[in-house]
């Protein structure tokens, strides 16, 4: 198989690997093939082989806001975490798709650049953060992104401006066109380094206080419906602390689903569907997932 030829060329490709090793929920079935490219050239070669041989292709970043079903994923899964270079040029920071949002935000801060403080505790990768326009504490990626470099499924390199990314709440054009984020450049403002770092430390302390970081979790599961907050609705509906299998709606922060031990992706999804059903019945509000759900049923 062509993929195995690339393996002989030195690209890190594995077979039948449990994706639960990589997801923040510690759940998920196997990847038929799993690759960890170290350069954009390796990404291009992998994409080309999948297109020429009609092999299904799935791109994953830090797997922090992701649920992979227990049946796993056919074809090739590419995890981009080996692409992690971060460069500072004046008031701009350029980070590879696999660089963590946290590392990028702190690199900016340590250079006295302001504009990514909100991202100090977001556990995802730059690629995933751009893909879903990640945000926290009143800030979103769209406010800092200047441009995004991508590789299309057809193997073409492109650069999108902020406007071309079509950002909105937890959305970007990448979700629609399937392009692969390779890097993003952030346009920031000079600031007081110590004040920036102090603010980031404060936000991280707030996060530790409010969020159930002691358990595996995919973070905030649901998008916020207009005019409502998910947590209070879940509490009033009597669902906080509800558990199915090893998956529990957190007693510390309603709307976060944690793995209390031995949870499967099916446990997670059953609990998500239960919460959606009860909230619809009680409030006539459709809760949509912020977390990305992929893979096959078991």
UniProtKB/Swiss-Prot annotation:
Its cofactor is FAD. Its EC number is 1.3.1.98. One of its GO terms (biological process) is cell wall organization. One of its GO terms (molecular function) is FAD binding. PROSITE patterns: FAD_PCMH. Keywords: Cell cycle, Cell division, Cell shape, Cell wall biogenesis/degradation, Cytoplasm, FAD, Flavoprotein, NADP, Oxidoreductase, Peptidoglycan synthesis. Belongs to the MurB family. HAMAP family: MurB (MF_00037). Transmembrane segments: none annotated. It catalyses: UDP-N-acetyl-alpha-D-muramate + NADP(+) = UDP-N-acetyl-3-O-(1-carboxyvinyl)-alpha-D-glucosamine + NADPH + H(+). It is found in: Cytoplasm. GO terms for cellular component: cytosol. It is an enzyme of class 1 (oxidoreductase). Cell wall formation. This is UDP-N-acetylenolpyruvoylglucosamine reductase. It comes from the Bacteria. The active site is at residues 170, 220, 290. Residues 26-191 form the FAD-binding PCMH-type domain. Pathway: Cell wall biogenesis; peptidoglycan biosynthesis.
